């Protein structure tokens, strides 16, 4: 559970790097996705797949707004520890 909260916090920190007009959309999108997967199977593979997806999607959004993906280094460390 702690890792899930750390990943969520990492995603929300990246949302703050986005342009001001797009932050509310991505903050809501991230929250909805974390809430939707609250009841997911707690096996390591299920969670690892979700962490991989969260990281990849975060990179995609950063690239979309021309933000250097090195900003997601901390999230990568959390997701793949």
Curated annotation (Swiss-Prot):
Q: Source organism's superkingdom?
A: Eukaryota
Q: Which GO terms describe its cellular component?
A: cytosol
- List the PANTHER family hit by this protein, alphabetically: OS01G0342800 PROTEIN
Say which family it is in.
Belongs to the complex I LYR family. LYRM9 subfamily.
What's the name of the protein? LYR motif-containing protein At3g19508
Per the UniProt record, the source organism is: Arabidopsis thaliana (Mouse-ear cress)
């Amino acid at each position: 559970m702690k890792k899930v909260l750390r990943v969520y916090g990492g995603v929300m920190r990246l949302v703050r790097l986005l342009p001001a007009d797009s932050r509310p959309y991505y903050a809501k999108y991230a929250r909805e996705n974390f809430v939707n997967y609250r009841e997911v199977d707690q096996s390591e593979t299920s969670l690892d797949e979700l962490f991989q997806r969260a990281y990849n999607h975060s990179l995609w959004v950063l690239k979309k707004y021309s933000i250097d993906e090195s900003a997601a280094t901390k999230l990568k460390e959390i997701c793949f520890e």
